[in-house]
Amino acid sequence: MARKYPLDKFRNFGIMAHIDAGKTTTTERILFYTGINHKIGETHDGASTMDWMVQEQERGITITSAATTCAWKEHELNIIDTPGHVDFTVEVERSLRVLDGAVTVLDAKSGVEPQTETVWRQADKYGVPRMIYVNKMDATGADFFRCISTVRDRLKGNAVPIQIPIGSEENFQGMIDLIRNVAILFYDDLGKDMREEAIPAEYAEKAEEYRAAMIEAIAEADEELMMKYLEGEEITEEELKAGLRKATIANEIYPCICGSSYKNKGVQQMIDGVVDYLPSPLDIPAVKGTNLEGEEAERNAADGEPLSALAFKIATDPFVGKLAYTRIYSGIMESGSYVLNSTKGKKERIGRLVKMHSNSRQEVESLEAGELGAVIGLKNTGTGDTLCSEKDPIILESMEFPEPVISVAIEPKTKAAQEKMGMALAKLAEEDPTFKTWTNEETGQTIIAGMGELHLDIIVDRLKREFKVECNVGAPQVAYKETIRKAVKAEAKYAKQSGGKGQYGHAVIEMEPTEGEYVFENAIVGGAIPREYIPAVDNGIQEASLNGIIAGYNVINFKVRLVHGSYHEVDSSEMAFKIAGSMAFKNAMAKADPVLLEPVEKVEITVPEEYMGDVIGDVNSRRGRMEGMEEVSGAQVIRAFVPLSEMFGYATSLRSRTQGRGVYSMVFDHYEEVPKSIQEEVAGNKTK
């Protein structure tokens, strides 16, 4: 089947933002203008096309990122709508992994908010080029220029306006396009009656100032344009666009535009911006991975290359079963063909292939390089797995997901539903890598763990709705961690000789605190421990580190060097060295000044001035550490770091303190040492 659009006409992009910045409404408007929806879905009345899970329609927030295909001006757009609620960062993380570009939506009255920072950092990690759309310009308190300065101050991004607004709040009428030097004015609420006019006289000076700043920023990123600029030559519209496109794709500039999605002003210009400035699959570097021998390999975006694709999301559909949302990086995937899941080393048959439009679908015969679609019929494929050609296998880099920070015990209301609940939880864990479930061996209880209270609420809600399992839920528990504060040397000898073959393993280790991942270094010289037993020592240490000595929590941020040991010709075995490694770790930890760590959240609270003293006092009583305050649109925004264990039930407390006028958001920030008294309390609770 011939391509409908060449690869350079593809735009795979996401729409990302803080909760309530108007992301889903913006996507709805894109679908409306690109001709897929005939009536615009409103998030307010629960009819939005992109928010298709029942819980999303009720809560008015986006939980699962729905991938949608549409067309605009001879380009194919694949849009991924990502949730802005902090508990669903996994959705943002996995969609960013497969995007080529993104539109960051900001609320014109709030600017950069905590979740914007989180999502921005995630996009930085994957090097995703972005443009910024300042939405809700019609809202009270809207301020485009303050918004742009929050991007520069809080995100350290080189935000360059390529439009400036005409009017704001209820007087928002349109924008000035600085590239083409014209005013775009809207005369109706559906964005149909839109006219280009000369720039109004009262805006001429401001437009000139911002246009000069924009031209200078674009010229700085391009030597040829810089020469023209310095020599005072006129830079054409085409040159400006080409220069801006290059700088945006290189992450040197973030073009900024404005609008009001709800009032249908500025959305078409935003889609034009996506086409003009965000990358096609050909503009991004070749995707990297490793072949089965562990050597580096890469694939270019081309139909003629061997197939490589990444399954970035697994969803269960009531009608067709398991859907694997997939990005094709190279080659062609055909329905009915066989591919290799190189991550798991298993062959898979491609059943049907569909292109998704939110939650309706169109069947296709094949998906080509650069396309996004869903595969039906895969048996063994999970999130982050690579699907590739059997002849030329490649394993693409998988995705990293954060560990859960909160857990609750859960039990079905009837004994008969126990098995059903187990199967349902396994299905949900397959869909969402940040959701974990296990059985507590001491109590026999089923534990579910996730990224926040809302995350677990929705899991329990889905159990009831989709799987018809009603559950009782216990009080939330915090996922503490343990670590060490000083470097030590320790040893352990495991010896068992009681007739017949004995056991013997002896390991001497040095252990020290470190920032970041666990590191094991083999420093054995002269064969004190035979090479084949060294991985066993490492395994013993890793296994023992899952249960620290203070309160049995996972031990993090440490490094181990295996420096010496001894073995027995007959009695030594992998098992003996594994036990020796585990014992050496426990001995070392006891001497290394162990401490308990707790998750600390970055909290942002917005309250009217009169409640500020009370709210700050409350934050301090929760062991909060103030980071700063500022006034935004007549309200006070308080920023602080607060331990997660102190934030349970905060929504209710804030509501009663501020008569329902305060709002807050929080995002996991880091782990930090707990005070001695709390460490003793946690350790005491664990031993009860």
Curated annotation (Swiss-Prot):
Keywords per UniProt: Cytoplasm, Elongation factor, GTP-binding, Nucleotide-binding, Protein biosynthesis
Pfam families in the cross-refs: EF-G_D2, EFG_C, EFG_III, EFG_IV, GTP_EFTU
Keyword GTP-binding appears in the UniProt entry: yes
UniProt subcellular location: Cytoplasm
SMART domains: EFG_C, EFG_IV
A GO CC annotation given for this chain: cytoplasm
RNA-binding found in the keyword field: no
Binding annotation for GTP: 17-24, 81-85, 135-138
Molecular function terms from GO: GTP binding; GTPase activity; translation elongation factor activity
Coarse class of the protein's main subcellular location: cytoplasm
PANTHER family cross-referenced by the UniProt entry: RIBOSOME-RELEASING FACTOR 2, MITOCHONDRIAL, TRANSLATION ELONGATION FACTOR G-RELATED
Family, as annotated: Belongs to the TRAFAC class translation factor GTPase superfamily. Classic translation factor GTPase family. EF-G/EF-2 subfamily.
HAMAP family: EF_G_EF_2_B (MF_00054_B)
Function: Catalyzes the GTP-dependent ribosomal translocation step during translation elongation. During this step, the ribosome changes from the pre-translocational (PRE) to the post-translocational (POST) state as the newly formed A-site-bound peptidyl-tRNA and P-site-bound deacylated tRNA move to the P and E sites, respectively. Catalyzes the coordinated movement of the two tRNA molecules, the mRNA and conformational changes in the ribosome.
Protein known as: Elongation factor G
Origin species: Clostridium botulinum (strain Eklund 17B / Type B)
